[in-house]
Each structure stands twice: as C-alpha cells, then as structure tokens.
Curated annotation (Swiss-Prot):
Gene Ontology BP terms: regulation of transcription by RNA polymerase II
Keywords: Developmental protein, DNA-binding, Homeobox, Nucleus, Transcription, Transcription regulation
Taxonomic source organism: Danio rerio (Zebrafish)
Protein name, as recorded: Homeobox protein Hox-B10a
Stretches assigned to coiled coil: none
Length: 279
C-alpha cells in the first residue's frame, strides 16, 4: 500500500483532497514507542519540530473527544461549549492527579466560566454537568467560595443602604423646603398653638397668680366682716385705702368670706340637727 505525500505544517496536518468527516475516523490504537522515545511504525509521525520525544498521549480519551465533535457537527444546533467542557473535564482530571499545578487549574477554571457566560442557553444535561462541576470546585476550594459569598453579601448590603439613603435625602430636602417657605406670621401662629397645647395640659393654664394677703390686711378685713358682711361702696373704698388694696380685691374677699360662712353653717346643721346657728 503506497502512502501519498501531504504538505506538513508545524503543529497540524492537512490534506489536499476532500477532508473526511470526523465521524468516519477509526479508533486509533496506542502508538508503539522505543526506549529512545522515537516511533518505529512508519505510519505515525511526530508533530514536534525539535525532534524531542513527547509523552505518550491518552489515545482513548482523544478518540472519545473526536467522536463527540463529529456527533455535534452532524446535529442541527452546534454548541462548542460541550466539546470544550469535555476537554476541560479531561484537563481537570489531569490536574487532580498533579497537585503541584494550581495555576493551570485556576486558568482553566476562568476559561470555563468565561465560555459558559458567552455561550448560548444549554440543555438540561449541560446544566446538570455545570452544577456538578461547581459543586466539585466548591468542595475543592471552600475558602475561595466562602470569600466570594461574603463579598457578594457585602455588595448587596451596601447597595441596599445606598438606596435607603437616596430615599431619605429627598424627604429631608422637602421638609426643609417647606419650613423655609413659612412667613413670620405663620411661625408666630405655630408658636402660639404649641404654647396653647402645653398650657392646656398644665393644671393652672388660664388662671392669674394668687396674691396672698398679709396678716395685717386679713385682720382688718375680718374685723370689718364681723360688723358688716355687706359693705357700701364708700366703706369699701375707705378700707381699700387703709390696707393698701384695690376696691375689686376687697369686694372679692368679702364675697369669698360670705360663701365660706354659708358652707360652715351647712356643715354644722348636718352634723348637729337639734342646734340652731344664727348668722
């Protein structure tokens, strides 16, 4: 069987003729390697331009990837994220076996998240695979997931507090604006209404201050009351001038004194009904 010559490009191989579909590719068997690292079979060739020996590849995994890509090309709706996800699963499995490469795993995680954000809506099976991958990553790096959750909670609380502050500030501005628009007359009316409310709550709101009489004034008034319970205007003026009081004060004092005397006689009659007390 004669082999056809094909143009060779570093890192890739192409054919001049019609390219076959990936579905029609047969499963590739393992490549035989010698102790020096070079291949003995002439049907295999290396893609390394330096000629150095390469590590043996996982051919079964490669064939499975190619089969998946062929099935996707034959379908109507092509989603590249599925093939990338399968390759990413292999990469994550390789990084799990090699714990000394955290940078490679973090880079692959970021690429996977970026491809998921830019890809079209996936089916339910793809969503299940993504959820399983996120659960595996959360169990693998719990500290990073906890930090991201705390950062998201802090951002939400800050946004809520900013919204509440923005809602409160217009209300404060409106109240200040209404207070500044009041005229002096309205301000005085508000002050009088507040004073009236406070005075209504107090016990002695509308009463004048009580003016206590001195002992000399009370003695002179009591003497005059013993002789005359009802005074004439001239006598009332004389008494007011003598004890340094006004005519109205003397008149009110005599009225109160007469009411007190009636009250005393009424109580005395109820206490001793047999006795009579003349006024």
């Amino acid at each position: 069987m004669a082999l056809h010559r094909h143009p060779f490009v570093h890192g890739a191989a192409s054919w001049d003729g019609e390219q076959p579909s990936p579905v029609q590719l047969p499963h590739i068997s393992a490549c035989p390697f010698t102790s020096s690292g070079r291949k003995e079979d002439p049907f295999y060739f290396t893609l390394d331009p330096t000629g150095q020996a390469r590590q043996p590849l996982d051919i079964s995994a490669f064939s499975r990837i190619m089969t998946d890509m062929g099935s996707l090309n034959s379908a109507d709706d092509h989603r590249p994220e599925t093939s990338f996800y399968s390759g990413h699963k292999l990469l994550s499995l390789n990084t799990d076996t090699d714990p000394e490469s955290p940078s490679l795993s973090s880079h692959s995680d970021s690429q996977h998240l970026h491809s998921l954000s830019l890809s079209a809506p996936c089916s339910e099976t793809d969503n299940k695979h993504d959820m399983q991958y996120l659960a595996m990553e959360s169990t693998k790096y719990p500290s990073q997931w906890s930090e991201s959750r705390t950062n998201r909670s802090i951002i939400t609380t800050l946004s809520i507090s900013q919204r509440s502050k923005d809602d409160i500030e217009p209300n404060n501005l409106q109240t200040d604006f209404t207070r500044g628009d009041k005229t002096p007359r309205e301000k005085t009316q508000d002050v009088t209404l507040e004073n009236a409310a406070n005075g209504w709550l107090s016990a002695k709101a509308g009463r004048k201050k009580r003016c206590p009489y001195s002992k000399h004034q009370i003695l002179e008034l009591e003497k005059e009351f013993l002789f005359n319970m009802y005074l004439t205007r001239e006598r009332r003026l004389e008494i007011s001038r003598s004890i340094n009081l006004t005519d109205r004060q003397v008149k009110i004092w005599f009225q109160n004194r007469r009411m007190k005397l009636k009250k005393m006689t009424r109580e005395h009659r109820t206490r001793d009904p047999g006795t009579s007390f003349t006024v």
